[in-house]
Design a protein with these regions (language model features):
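N-terminal helical cap/lid subdomain that shapes the substrate entry/recognition surface
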Residues: 4-120
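Substrate-recognition "cap/lid" segment bordering the active-site pocket of phosphatases
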Residues: 103-105, 112, 125-153
């Protein structure tokens, strides 16, 4: 039947998981790592990355909200006068992977929601800026993998 919805593709962070609660602590931790615990430099890095210092929130199109670990490493390494972008990228990827799984805060009972949607015959997918491995690990940790037809990280 034309016009029938057959599938739903969800964005992970900010839709299924509380973006701020999940990622603000991770972003601050890598800023501390990069800045060597220099409070002024940490604040500068967070501002460069897209955090509003007045609200503590991240601009939706900022590197911290929508960029890759590589983009963030390039930005912050340049601001710190560092030349270890490749090493920072590896560190950020590993940190985000661990933190994203451990600290993700679902906005509702996601397995129940996804189960109801599957019961209606819908195909379900997730899209995220996370790495593919981190996306899969988060879906597995929250019991969503059996419900998903597609995960794109």
């Amino acid at each position: 039947m034309p016009g029938t919805i057959r599938a739903v593709l969800f964005d992970k962070d900010g839709t299924l998981f509380d973006f701020f609660a999940t990622w603000a602590p991770a972003n601050e931790a890598i800023a501390r790592h990069t800045a060597g615990d220099d409070p002024a430099l940490i604040e500068r890095l967070m501002t460069l990355g897209g955090r509003d210092s007045a609200t503590g929130r991240f601009a939706p199109v900022s590197v911290l909200a929508a960029g890759t670990a590589r983009q963030l490493a390039e930005l912050w390494a340049g601001a710190c006068g560092r030349d270890d972008v490749a090493e920072l990228t590896l560190y950020y990827d590993a940190h985000f992977h661990r933190h994203g799984v451990a600290s993700a805060e679902p906005v509702c009972d996601l397995p129940a929601l996804f189960g109801r949607l599957r019961d209606r015959g819908l195909k379900l997918g997730i899209a995220t800026m996370d790495s593919p491995a981190a996306a899969e690990a988060t879906m597995q940790a929250f019991g969503l993998s059996p419900h998903l037809d597609f995960v794109c990280g």
